[in-house]
Amino acid sequence: MEKQNEEISTDDAETSQSQLVDDSKVETLDDCVSKVETLDDCVSKVETLDDCVSKAETLADCVSKVETLDDCVSKVKTLDDCVSKVENLDDCVPKVETLDDCVPKVETLDDCVSEVETLDDCVSKAQGLKEEGNKLFQKRDYDGAMFKYGEAIKILPKDHVEVSHVRANVASCYMQLEPGEFAKAIHECDLALSVTPDHNKALLKRARCYEALNKLDLALRDVCMVSKLDPKNPMASEIVEKLKRTLESKGLRINNSVIELPPDYVEPVGASPAALWAKLGKVRVKKTKKSNQVEEKSEGEGEDVEPEKKNNVLAEKGKEKIKMKVKGKQSDKRSDTSKEQEKVIIEEELLVIGVEDVNKDVKFVYSDDIRLAELPINCTLFKLREVVHERFPSLRAVHIKYRDQEGDLVTITTDEELRMSEVSSRSQGTMRFYVVEVSPEQDPFFGRLVEMKKLKITADSFKAKVNGRGGCKVEDWMIEFAHLFKIQARIDSDRCLNLQELGMKLNSEAMEEVVTSDAAQGPFDRAAQQFQEVAARSLLNLGYVHMSGARKRLSLLQGVSGESVSEQVKTAYECAKKEHANAKEKYEEAMKIKPECFEVFLALGLQQFEEARLSWYYVLVSHLDLKTWPYADVVQFYQSAESNIKKSMEVLENLETGKESEPSQAGKTDCLTHEKDLGSSTQNNPAKEAGRLKSWIDILLCAVLYERSIMEYKLDQPFWRESLEAAMEKFELAGTCKDDVVEIISEDYVAGNTLRDIRFHMEEIIQIFDEIYEAKHWTNGIPSDQLEEILKRRAENIFHVPNIAIQRG
């Protein structure tokens, strides 16, 4: 029992202890709840963040559902981490606020647009400056033009396409200067090509500069490049042909824009540059040995000299003798110094003598002519030029070239370049110099050589005079002195001012200045009118040729008879129609060129009138059925002829009105009377001449209306009488007597005003006109022979073929 009681008490004690422990645990849980409450406060601070609130609510639910203390504590710790994360969310606000900073960046797009607009403004401004420079260039103000071009280049971007065009214009200015600045022009072309490598104008201008500098190989390279880029460029083709002719005349050949040398002959045996340098080395070794011997000899003689006496030491090398006195009382140091100086002097003299004695063999190649010569080592360019002059006496001014390691022909212009040619030819054997003939202005030594030649001739003659008479005059001495002074001062006294060239230059400049002015527009307009008139009259005359051809076709039918008459008539009709079509085409072209020339309208009306008569009488000759024949085309011919003749009358009246309004320009008449149709005219009375023209046009219009009335009558048209009455009115306007004309045709009328057979009695009409001309001298100025010529055209020879009767009634 006691044991049981003890066990029970022990269990109660354990139970009480466990309850105490549970109570302590519960207290810590309250602390957790208090912590959770503080977390709720934290969540309330970040109420604006929906995600954090949702997380906090979820944590509160977790706390209420916590079954164990460890889970709660772990949750609380996790909540602390969440709070720290929530607190870090405040840092995100400034990042969001930085979006406002993006607005100005977006606004910079407008700045980009403004920059693009600014670029367009710069380009337009540069083009304006370029146009101003072009105007100054046309006025020969090259400095002002280059200034404008320079301003345009400053405005444009460096890699803009317009820069190449402007620099090409600058190169043109340099080329036009006196004398031409071709080197600067080439530099500008290089800058233009650096922006646009395929700029044709820059390549052509650089080629012209190279040609002016006689660098034909470089000029040919640029021009061939232009030909490849633009095969149809006429200027490039012209320059290529010119360069080829120039190079071929000098014995050179062109193979695909590469200059080839002529075939060389077999080289004679001579000293090569390697042997030349070896020879020079032997001379130097020999000189060194001799100098050592001189030194030993001088030392030995120095030892034999007694102190109280003076001895003479002689050192002899080649042709030079060096004497040196050595005093006996001098110290050994001074004696040694003098010996060293003696050795150096002897060595230098021997070196100079050896170099002067050594020459090198060279070849001069001119076209197919190759000649040998000798040159001293390290000679000057002028010396080389003298040798060329001696070897080729017939040549005047030349350039001397050598072939470099790349195979290009390089012109030698300085002594340094001559040294470079010697270095590049060491591996080629005998040195070769290529002689190219140029103009005297391009050879800097030509003037000096000419003066030296004259001086030599003068000196020879002077010596001959001295030897011949034993004395000379002061004048000869003055002439010689003048030649020497001219050579030294480089004064060209023989050059005089060419007044003719200067006058022509000033004249051309003045003409260009006048041409570019506003006052030149009037003469230009008058010149344009004259050229238009010349072109229109040429086409007008060509139309006359076709009309004459059509009439000639018809005149060949006279005397034709037999069965083949109809075929020949048809062939002649078709050929005449073709000639009429060609004449009409030429007249219409003349009308487009010179629409205010009344002669064009008159010629076109006459052509349409003759074509209408040709078609109508061909129908009559062919005996076609007039009821089924389509006559609309012939009627249209008559209407067009009448319209054009009236138009010519209107243009003539307008010309007269213009002459009256501008009496000062009375001589500026665009269209005058054509001599072929009008014959001789009175130049002293323009009003009388105009009256004659109007009368002639009225008669031509009368003939058109009369022929039309005949056709309309045959076709049973009701308005034939109107055409006939209009023709009678025109006869009256032309100055004829209406009663006489009516009397002629009255025999053809019958009762009821029906036309039985209208025939134009040519002989009677001409007789009446002759009587009027004799009585009244044709107050309107139209002679009867002209009227006869016009009226005879009413029926061609095709309508008078034998054995063919034309029935009209």
Swiss-Prot record:
The answer to keyword Transmembrane applying to this record is: no
TPR repeat copies, ranges: 126-159, 164-199, 200-233, 235-265, 274-311, 508-541, 563-597, 615-648, 709-741
Occurrences of domain PB1 (ranges): 359-438
Q: Name one Pfam family in it.
A: PB1
Keywords assigned by UniProt?
Answer: Phosphoprotein, Repeat, TPR repeat
Where is the stretch described as Disordered?
Answer: 1-22, 288-339, 656-686
Residue positions where Phosphoserine is found in the record: S298
Summarize what gene deletion causes: Phox1, phox3 and phox4 triple mutants and phox1, phox2, phox3 and phox4 quadruple mutants show a 70% reduction in root hair growth.
Q: In which residue ranges is the amino acid composition biased (Basic and acidic residues)?
A: 307-339
TM ranges are: none
UniProt induction comment: Up-regulated by abscisic acid treatment, and by cold and salt stress.
Q: What does this protein do?
A: Carboxylate clamp type tetratricopeptide repeat protein that may act as a potential Hsp90/Hsp70 co-chaperone. Contributes to polar growth of root hairs.
Per its record, how is this protein called by name? Protein PHOX3
Q: What organism does the UniProt record list as the source?
A: Arabidopsis thaliana
**Gene name in the database record:** PHOX3
